[in-house]
A protein has these predicted regions:
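A structural signal for multi-pass alpha-helical bundles of membrane permease subunits
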Residues: 2-287
Length: 287
């Protein structure tokens, strides 16, 4: 009897988690895949028609292109700036205060940040009173105001700047913790051997930070693929700024097309899988 009870004990502990996983993750995922093969009202089977829309429609091709733009500039920007601030702030006297200032945008909701930056980018025709901070500065120095959110491709980069402003502090905090974990003996030994700061950074700092960098990069990549809040609040995907997640939202709630929205969700999920696989593989190597 005791042996049987011992065999059931792991199931008792794991069972609720497995049931929760099946109900709230596996079932919705499978249902989404099923709905992606149905029409807008989930009444008739349409085969791969929704996936054809995802990969051939002009609006989705624009969304893929913009997500790729975010993938490159946002990821490189946040990780590079985060690493730079992590190293520089570690050397200043008021480290905690400096970190708090840089990290502060993360404390603001992404919707709130989008609203603030939308006002900063606000455009009025030349000759009108400018209420946007950036255009007011341009006018003061004798330049014409720019439609930061209206003109492509500058509007995509203007949106990416908002993402950098929000997420750089997050990257800095994670990389700063890893940077402080680098043994000082390694750095001192390298300096004794005649290594300059660039060589120390290349041969000691980067290799020691590689696990943290991998985690931060994969986190930023996932954030890029599902970027939504900033786009929705500031442009709603108009003027050539559409992205995958925002298009999925529109298809589902604005156009009531469940089939297309589900197909976009499935494609987005498949795009995230390789990133998560690389992250898990890195963790297993470290273990």
């Amino acid at each position: 009897m005791r042996r049987k009870t011992g065999g059931l004990t792991p199931l008792i502990y794991v069972g609720p988690a497995v049931i929760f996983l099946l109900i709230y993750q596996m079932y919705p995922a499978l249902q989404t895949i099923y709905l992606s093969f149905l029409d807008r009202r989930s009444e008739a089977f349409v085969g791969l028609e929704n996936y054809k829309y995802v990969f051939t429609s002009q609006v989705m091709l624009t969304a893929f292109k913009n997500n790729l733009l975010w993938l490159v500039f946002f990821t490189v920007g946040t990780v590079s700036l985060g690493l730079l601030f992590a190293i520089l702030v570690d050397k200043v006297k008021y480290e905690s205060f400096a970190k708090s200032i840089i990290f502060m945008p993360m404390a603001i909701s992404f919707v709130g940040a989008g609203v603030v930056w939308k006002f900063m980018y606000t455009y009025k025709p030349p000759g009108s009173g400018q209420i946007g901070l950036l255009n007011q500065i341009l006018v003061i120095f004798g330049f014409e105001p720019k439609g930061w959110l209206l003109e492509s491709p500058i509007n995509n980069f203007a949106l990416i700047v908002v993402g950098l402003w929000i997420w750089t502090g997050y990257c800095m905090v994670l990389l700063s913790a890893a940077y402080k974990g680098i043994p000082k003996e390694l750095v001192e030994a390298a300096e004794v051997d005649g290594a300059n700061q660039l060589q120390v950074f290349r041969h000691i700092t980067i290799p020691e930070l590689r696990p943290a960098l991998t985690m931060v990069v994969t986190t930023m990549l996932v954030n890029v693929l599902k970027i939504f809040d900033i786009i929705y609040v500031m442009t709603n995907g108009n003027f050539g700024t559409e992205v995958i997640a925002n298009r999925m939202f529109k298809e589902m709630f604005q156009f009531s097309n469940t089939g297309r929205a589900s197909a976009i969700a499935v494609v987005l999920f498949l795009m995230i899988i390789p990133i998560m696989y690389a992250n898990v593989r890195q963790k297993l190597r470290e273990g």
